[in-house]
Amino acid sequence: ASRGLGDVYKRQHQTNADRIGITRRQVKTVTYAFLYGAGNTKLGYSYDKLLSEKAAAVKGAEIRKAYIAAIPGLADLLLACEKASKRGYANAIDGRRISVDKGHKFLNYLLQGSAATIAKRWMVIVNECLPPDGHQLSFVHDELNYECYPRFAEEFAKWLETAARLAGEHYNLRCPIAAEAKIGYTWADVH
């Protein structure tokens, strides 16, 4: 049984593309540039590498404005990040302090730190109830891969999905955490 949160992200990328008026292919690159703290010029180049520097800065500003308008609460989050970045650290969802060296990186550190913490909690919960002779094979980014006897695969796949939800609940998140489990004999079968 295997699967991560990838399909959830794919759907969200399409939703963002539709809201902002860019293609699905562009939105993933642009979204990550935005979340990782790119300035307007870099954001514009993420949209189209062939733009002039001035045109990229203008396009980047348009994209930034569209994102902020399209995603409820984003403006407030960015303002809170700007204020909190002045102290030099972010408070992780598990209470740890994450050092932030530059203000424009604050949101990225907060998101990456939170995602890693949730994914690790997910792994811990899953491993508490492994099927007989079940083994974890890998943990890559937001994906857990396990092996087990075929007779346990369906039940274990359901447990993987439940454990993702429980990981989010562990941190009292307001947005649900979801995962989709897939069953196959090889890594390629589940991708």
List each language-model region with its residue ranges:
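Conserved beta-strand -> loop -> alpha-helix junction used to position metal-binding or nucleic-acid-contacting
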Residues: 10-14
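Short amphipathic alpha-helices in soluble, non-transmembrane regions
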Residues: 156-164
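Conserved short beta-strand edge segments in small beta-sheet-based binding/regulatory domains
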Residues: 168-182
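Histidine-centered divalent-metal-coordination microenvironment in nucleic-acid enzymes
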Residues: 145-147
